[in-house]
Structures are given as C-alpha cells and as structure tokens.
C-alpha cells in the first residue's frame, strides 16, 4: 500500500492512490513464482535445468506466458517503484530525513528472517545431497553480504542464500541514488530523472553483467513518467494509446523470453502504462481492494524460494521424487503456499516488525534530542528478481 501525506504539493499528482499499480504488484509476484518453477526440474545435486524443462512444467501450455516471461516482473517492480517513490517523496519536504529509517523498517526484517530460514534449509539440503540447492556459494562471507543487503553489489561470487533477493540488493543502490538526487529532482524534475534513466539503460546495454544498471534505468524511468504526468495530467488519455501501441510493438518485435536488457522493455513499459490507464479510469476508487492485495507481493516474493526448498526436501523423500512436481497439484500447493505466506507475513510479521523498527528509531532520536518528523511515510516494497531460466 502506498501512503502519502495530505499536504498539497506542486510535485504530487491529484490522484492519492494508484490501486491498479498496487494490485499489479501481486500479479507480478505470481509471474516470478511461475518463472522459478523450473527449479523443481533440476535433478538432485545438479543445479541446472534440463533443456526440455518446459515440457516438465505442469500446464505449461496454459501458463506459457508466465513460465517463459515471468522474469520481466522484476523489471516491472523497478519501474513501479520509481513512480511510487516520486509520488510519495517528491512533494514531502521532510521525507529525506526519514527516508532510510522507513526503507529499512519496511525491507530488512523480512529479508533477515528469510535469509536465516534459507540458511537452515540449505544446511539440511547439503547434508542430504552434498551441495546447495540452486544458489551457491552459501558461506560466511556471502551471509555477511546478505546481512547488509550488499550481496549483489559486485562483491559476490554468485547468487547466494535466498537468491531472488538479488534485485532487492541492487534496488537499495537505486534508493541511494534517488535519496542523493532528491533535492535536484525537486528542482529540475524531468531532466534529471530522464538523464538517470537513459544513463542506466545505456550502461545496461554495454555492461550487461551488473544488475544495477537496468534497475536504475527502469526505476528512474518510472520517476520520469511521474514528472511527465505532472506536466500533462489532462493528457492522461494518451496512456491507453501508449499501452496499446507498446503492446502491439512488443508482440511484433520482442516475442522471445530473453533475460538481457533491453529485451522485454517494451512489455514492461506497456504494461506499466496499462496499469496507469486503469488507475486513471478508476476515479471512484473501486479498486481500493488492490492496496491490500499488493501488500502481499513482497512476502510472496521473498518466501517463494524457501517454500520451494521445503517442497523439494519433501519430494526427495517420496516415491517418484521431483518428478511429482510435473503434476499440477504440486504447482497449486507451491502457488498457494507462497501467496498465502505473503499475506500472512505482511499481517503478522512485516507490519509488526516495521512498527517496532520505527518505534526504536523514534526512541533513539528522542534520546539524542533530534527533532521528530511527522508520521513516517510507508511505501510498499517491490522486489522482485529473477534468476536465469537455466541457473548454474
């Protein structure tokens, strides 16, 4: 859920809630769940999917778009994040002072919990199979990098522990750039955001090995889109035109499930424009339910790999082993468990932990005599990252 102050601002759109964007985050998280289903097709001790993994995924013909293109949901998370941050932080003069407290309170507790859970599950898996499941190395160095959310900043030897959290790691760097540039963004607005987006996109093309660059490109692309709407809110009717043209071009020129930027960019931008179009038409707030549904996306995203690992540990003990994952019933159990964990986690862990961190920060500030800002802003976290469809 996106929470903003009620203060009027020339840097804030007149629409308070973007319910379709919130709802779309849950759909994006589900797409990532499908994308990573190939992990079930990996034989014990071999962290590479067979070349025919598509034929081993249940109901692949029905859900082919999600199985084959689900990785684009991570880029979608990034572009939505940039838009949401602009909506929440640009128009609030006090936001910069409490930015990092709000971000840490929202993101770090669940990241820490799932990190510890995966470490325990991987230890059990290694004891049985002899090597880690999908993601390695899982050593002390990479655990410490994960603790500081620095596990995909270039110091790593590969994806480790709760591997999908790599996108969270690089998005933290995008947050740092946003926080640093916030005063300039408020002054020059569109030009700065567009320059950062273009810089990230160009760097992603020429240095494709670093996940930060596409993250910056999409994140500040979302911020630039916000500035465009600030200047032309009465022209928002162009959004459905943009979405339609973009989707048509994507079908024609970007049909393959490639994982390297800029492949998939047409899909990401077009679906983002489509979600904004729905929000523009939703003037009566009929999609308000989407806020609560979107809140489950972060938990579903971070819990889905430990749930996968748990299911694999069980399947390996059953007659039939991992071949059972080819049945739609295992797919249903996996999806239900991950989505259910997302809702349960948000209600019973993420929100209480967030309140506890914010309260602790407030006590610390009072003890140091630091003036208290207004009620902290809360922005729903978006994380999503894919691994490749054939991880080593």
Segments from the language model and where they lie:
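Hydrophobic alpha-helical transmembrane bundles that constitute the permease/transmembrane domains
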Residues: 23-26, 69, 172, 176, ...
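Membrane-interface helix-loop-helix regions
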Residues: 50-69, 107-170, 176, 265-278
